[in-house]
Amino acid sequence: MKKSGILNRHLAGAIAELGHGDTVLVCDAGMPIPPGPRVIDLAFRAGTPSFAEVLDGLLDELVVEGATAAEEIRDANPDAAALLDVHFPWLEAVPHDELKARTAAARLVVRTGEARPYANVLLRCGVFF
């Protein structure tokens, strides 16, 4: 049994399969998920696990070279916007409809229990060297 890091076997396995340039959407409980991407649904109850908890856990294990969020996050969810600013000062902001469209090409979607709007970020995987 693993003793640290991401313990969810499905999520840990999906992370191990990611390569350079693959995209991962970390999303709130309300984000529409199109058919296509592999989905790991971690939502348990409204707010659990939170967007911040899941994002922090993923960032401990992923190399990220790009991140995209909906521009609407700034007004609708300042706490989540501030979290993304800390992790990704170079964050790309696009209209929410464009973020939803890009989700169709994601390799992986990790759905959280987050119940605040626009708590979504599309991560582009980098390489560790």
UniProtKB/Swiss-Prot annotation:
Catalytic residues as annotated in Swiss-Prot or TrEMBL: 20
Positions of substrate binding: 28, 96, 118-120
Keyword flag Ion transport: no
Reaction it catalyzes: beta-D-ribopyranose = beta-D-ribofuranose
Enzyme Commission no: 5.4.99.62
Compartments in which it is found: Cytoplasm
Gene3D superfamilies, per the entry: RbsD-like domain
InterPro entries: D-ribose_pyranase (IPR023064), RbsD-like_sf (IPR023750), RbsD_FucU (IPR007721)
Gene Ontology BP annotations: D-ribose catabolic process
Keyword annotations of the record: Carbohydrate metabolism, Cytoplasm, Isomerase
SUPFAM superfamilies registered for this protein in UniProt: RbsD-like (SSF102546)
Statement: the UniProt record of this protein carries the keyword Isomerase: yes
Top enzyme class: isomerase
Main localization (coarse): cytoplasm
CC per GO annotation: cytosol
Coiled coil: none
Record note on quaternary structure: Homodecamer.
HAMAP family attached to this UniProt entry: D_rib_pyranase
Homology family: Belongs to the RbsD / FucU family. RbsD subfamily.
PANTHER family: D-RIBOSE PYRANASE
Name the UniProt record assigns to this protein: D-ribose pyranase 2
